UniProtKB/Swiss-Prot annotation:
The lineage of its organism: Bacteria, Pseudomonadati, Pseudomonadota, Gammaproteobacteria, Enterobacterales. One of its GO terms (molecular function) is ATP binding. One of its GO terms (cellular component) is membrane. Is required not only for elongation of protein synthesis but also for the initiation of all mRNA translation through initiator tRNA(fMet) aminoacylation. GO terms for biological process: methionyl-tRNA aminoacylation. It is found in: Cytoplasm. The keyword Phosphoprotein does not apply. A motif ('HIGH' region) lies at residues 15-25. ATP binds at K336. Changing K336 to Q/A/E/R: Loss of activity. Residues 575-677 form the tRNA-binding domain. It catalyses: tRNA(Met) + L-methionine + ATP = L-methionyl-tRNA(Met) + AMP + diphosphate. This is Methionine--tRNA ligase. A motif ('KMSKS' region) lies at residues 333-337. The gene is metG.
Length: 677
């Protein structure tokens, strides 16, 4: 079915320029690249761009630690990032930096328009200031005791224990992360973006169907809580763009970071001249499509601040946000001590890019679900699907065609109906690629691969080859197998670019989406060479060991759980005494509808019942097994309102996460309500 060619601009979230690309990053870039490659196969004009997010206090401070300038550091990091993405065959049309002249000009333009339209407000605020470093402290550079639940060692913007959000000035006994000094309060004039003015527009955009349901639901929670004015300025010293006519004031990194999408595209337009127009994609009434692939941790900025900034400065809004979850490895968060915090470059020293591209693709859907890279399953799936089902289909037929028929395929299809079954699947598979239901697409393709191999098994060309006078049958059977291989590889082309190149060289033809409607008949293929090698667990073991060695080389030799969760700052006895730990009896435990992580626990404190939501479902798939157990809970934690209800405390557990979560229990004899001292 012929499609009308569309103009599409696709972006990935900008990697921060103070660290290496790891397998968590690669999920997003692979997901976007597969989608982009499919769009290009269908004849659409796609511009695929990215950039390094190169501003902010963390970059300034890390450069100081390294004894180099921020410009030098981000330049070196950009080269490393681009090398990693090229190694995974991410087909960017342009990769730029937010520290660019294009981004400076666009940031100043958007700011000036927002200011002219009355959306920038000035007011004096009190901030924490490090007297030793002579700098105001951003949220994440202050730690102290949570003002809500009194948990120690929490960052200045939100508590990782109770989930509360607050300003750094609300922290109890704050300390500078930079110097360890006790900050002092100091007044400073700041600039604020009037986000509440866009509430009605944003709610209409949310209801338009342009966003994933999970994103729209989360945005509704934010609307109900009320939008707040957004501080878009930071005080010197700061690495970034100085705000026009405001000496010593700089744009907050999250203002110019998304503008980096525009800056990278402007840079591409300037390189290409008249062949692509910036305004055609970014003007208010643009008919081009704009899609941002992002992780679920930055939805707030992309779904609220970014579209509001664009609306207020007379630019177009995104067509959609495509949000994905996190990556876990072997059921737990990536771990430096276990060697599962794997850098992209380390992966490529042990496996090819296509293997990870395939595994991620096979697990991805349009939902915001976390993806688990189970390394044993990875080996089994790559061997079973790519090697045994797809590549083997070509190898078991190519030998006969090359040796007996000089590489020339039969002039007719042996089974036209089977071939039609394969080509008819283009609509379903294409729709799955289009809607980002990648796992479904892979399942459909592998079902066809099973059909193809069943056909070859039933026709048994190795038997026919030994039978006198059946050369025509042999050529027809093997030609059919090779034609089915061609269709499979066409469907997999967005996922496996390097394998596709080798397949195209063997088939002596380019693989195109529409081309499969015409089978290869009387066509000469090239001599067959091995297309893909099997992988094994020894490679996995070497990969994990290499990742461990990198951690040892980069840091002090800390091993075990302490490498992933270092011991927090020393606290006083009085600090600890604020936390009221009690023995609790689990009276009931059940799944929480709508959540794949939470269990709802009913706890008896010896005269008082509590309802607690706990993220331990992955470790306790049978909640009934918890009923009757004693555990330890934080009894004086402030109640927390969640989408599923009110959580009235927190149970204590240990472990890295995933299936390795272990609920703490007291020794026999402890009673509900007993205090832990």
């Amino acid at each position: 079915m012929t499609q009308v060619a569309k103009k599409i601009l696709v972006t990935c979230a900008l990697p921060y320029a103070n660290g290496s690309i790891h397998l968590g990053h690669m999920l997003e870039h692979i997901q976007a690249d597969v989608w982009v490659r499919y769009q290009r196969m269908r004849g659409h004009e796609v511009n695929f761009i990215c950039a390094d997010d190169a501003h902010g206090t963390p970059i300034m401070l890390k450069a100081q630690q390294l004894g180099i300038t921020p410009e030098q550091m981000i330049g070196e990091m950009s080269q490393e990032h681009q090398t990693d993405f090229a190694g995974f065959n991410i087909s960017y049309d342009n990769y730029h930096s937010t520290h660019s002249e294009e981004n400076r000009q666009l940031s100043e333009l958007i700011y000036s328009r927002l200011k002219e339209n009355g959306f920038i407000k000035n007011r004096t605020i009190s901030q924490l200031y490090d007297p030793e470093k002579g700098m105001f402290l951003p949220d994440r550079f202050v730690k102290g005791t949570c003002p809500k639940c009194k948990s120690p060692d929490q960052y200045g913007d939100n508590c990782e224990v109770c989930g509360a959000t607050y300003s750094p000035t609300e922290l109890i006994e704050p300390k500078s992360v930079v110097s360890g000094a006790t900050p002092v309060m100091r007044d400073s004039e700041h600039f604020f973006f009037d986000l509440p003015s866009f509430s009605e527009m944003l709610q209409a955009w949310t209801r338009s169907g342009a966003l994933q349901e999970q994103v729209a639901n989360k945005m509704q929670e934010w609307f109900e809580s009320g939008l707040q004015q957004w501080d878009i300025s930071r005080d010197a010293p700061y690495f970034g763009f100085e705000i026009p006519n405001a000496p010593g004031k700089y744009f907050y990194v999250w203002l110019d970071a998304p503008i980096g999408y525009m800056g990278s595209f402007k840079n591409l337009c300037d390189k290409r001249g008249d062949s692509v127009s910036f305004d055609e994609y970014w003007k208010k009434d643009s008919t081009a499509e704009l899609y941002h692939f992002i992780g679920k941790d930055i939805v707030y900025f992309h779904s609220l601040f970014w579209p509001a900034m664009l609306e207020g400065s007379n630019f177009r809004k995104p067509s959609n946000l495509f949000v994905h979850g996190y990556v876990t490895v072997n059921g737990a968060k990536m771990s430096k001590s276990r060697g599962t915090f794997i850098k992209a470059s380390t992966w490529l020293n042990h496996f090819d890019a296509d293997s990870l591209r395939y595994y991620y693709t096979a697990k991805l859907s349009s939902r915001i679900d976390d993806i688990d890279l189970n390394l044993e399953d990875f080996v089994q799936r790559v061997n079973a699907d790519i090697v045994n089902k797809v590549v083997n289909l070509a190898s078991r037929n190519a030998g006969f065609i090359n040796k007996r028929f000089d590489g020339v395929l039969a002039s007719e299809l042996a089974d036209p109906q089977l071939y039609k079954t394969f080509t008819d699947a283009a609509e379903v598979i294409g729709e799955a690629w289009e809607s980002r239901e990648f796992g479904k697409a892979v399942r459909e393709i592998m079902a066809l691969a099973d059909l193809a191999n069943r056909y070859v098994d039933e026709q048994a060309p190795w038997v026919v080859a030994k039978q006198e006078g059946r050369d025509a049958d042999l050529q027809a059977i093997c030609s059919m197998g090779i034609n089915l291989f061609r269709v499979l590889m066409t469907y997999l082309k967005p996922v496996l670019p390097k394998l596709t190149e080798r397949a195209e060289a063997f088939l002596n033809t380019e693989l195109t989406w529409d081309g499969i409607q015409q089978p290869l008949l009387g066509h000469k293929v090239n001599p067959f060479k091995a297309l893909y090698n099997r992988i094994d667990m020894r490679q996995v073991e070497a990969l994990v060991e290499a990742s461990k060695e990198e951690v040892k080389a980069a840091a002090a030799p800390v091993t075990g759980p302490l490498a992933d969760d270092p011991i927090q700052e020393t606290i006083t006895f009085d600090d600890f005494a604020k936390v009221d730990l009690r023995v609790a009896l689990i009276e009931n435990a059940e799944f929480v509808e709508g959540s794949d992580k939470l269990l709802r626990l009913t706890l008896d404190l010896g005269g008082e019942k509590r309802n607690v939501f706990s993220g331990i479902r992955s470790a306790y798939p049978d909640p009934q097994a918890l009923i009757g157990r004693h555990t330890i809970m934080v009894a004086n934690l402030a109640p927390r309102k969640m989408r599923f209800g009110i959580s009235e405390g927190m149970v204590m557990a240990a472990g890295p996460g995933g299936k390795d979560i272990f609920l703490l229990s007291p020794d026999a004899g402890a009673k509900p309500g007993h205090q832990v001292k």
